[in-house]
Amino acid sequence: MEHGDHNPHHGGVVYMYDDMHYEVVLDPGGHHRIYFTEAMREDLPAAVASTVTLTVERPRRSPETLSGVIDQQGESWTFDGQPAAAKDTSVRVAFVVKGSEYWIDVPFIVPAQ
């Protein structure tokens, strides 16, 4: 695969930070995941990042900040929050990698079925 491969492997949306890709899988039911891959899209262990949070911004409601936990397989960060409608909802994705804090605001995009 080329460095330019941004195809989701888990049904989410792929973004980049430095030479690392991360896939954000948002669920309207409130069960979210983030997966990390390296530049060539080989899987990285979830522990490559730390302090991983999602802040869900819904219309006319207070923001909901979710702290992630690494799943039992060590493959992804998982989050459990309140249900969210995609319309007019955004999510701040934040994490620390190699000692550097990073965040980005993204639209709430429901994964492809």
Sequence positions of predicted segments:
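Intrinsically disordered, low-complexity terminal tails/loops enriched in metal-binding residues
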Residues: M1-Q113
